[in-house]
Amino acid sequence: MKCPFCAHPDTRVADSRLMEERNAVRRRRHCPNCGKRFGTLETAELKMPAVIGPDKKRSPFNAQRLRNDLTAAARKSALTPEQIDETVRLTEHRLYTSGQRDIPSAALADMVLKELLRQDTEAAVRFAALHKRFDNPADFASWLAQAVKTGGKA
């Protein structure tokens, strides 16, 4: 790395420390040319995949929209605001670490539904009614029966 003081092209790493809370590495560097020390912070550049809607349009993932949809689905259910926030955080984390460039909206809905079914079946049913494409009421009933039967592993 180039020294910020003298622009010497080669600096030495004196010390490296992992910063768990930020998923980063802090490095202390030393310039052999001018003798000055400086620090760097290295983080991985993770990109959020774009969401591909049913109309094949790409749009950025919107955590607030997911939070609003979960809040609407959780009305009159036992799902707490903290559980909603945790579901949003978990979904964001899974998307970041998936390594995918794009994710279909149906796959995103399934990802959220798996977590919701584990927490609150009533909220999951409301969310599914809004976000899964059912051709007819029988398909919805079939999905619901499978979700209840597998205990949230639908």
Swiss-Prot record:
Q: InterPro entries under this entry?
A: ATP-cone_dom, NrdR-like_N, RNR_NrdR-like
Report unnamed zinc finger ranges: 3-34
Which UniProt keywords are present, listed alphabetically?
ATP-binding, DNA-binding, Metal-binding, Nucleotide-binding, Repressor, Transcription, Transcription regulation, Zinc, Zinc-finger
Task: Give a GO molecular function annotation for the protein.
Answer: ATP binding
Q: Which cofactor does it need?
A: Zn(2+)
Q: Does the keyword rRNA-binding apply?
A: no
Q: Which domain of life is it from?
A: Bacteria
Free-text remark on how the cofactor is bound: Binds 1 zinc ion.
Q: List GO BP terms, alphabetically.
A: negative regulation of DNA-templated transcription
Question: Where is the ATP-cone domain positioned along the sequence?
Answer: 49-139
* Pfam families referenced in this protein's UniProt entry, alphabetically: ATP-cone, Zn_ribbon_NrdR
Name the family.
Answer: Belongs to the NrdR family.
Q: Which HAMAP family match?
A: NrdR (MF_00440)
Chain's role: Negatively regulates transcription of bacterial ribonucleotide reductase nrd genes and operons by binding to NrdR-boxes.
| Name of the protein in its database record | Transcriptional repressor NrdR
Gene source species: Neisseria meningitidis serogroup B (strain ATCC BAA-335 / MC58)
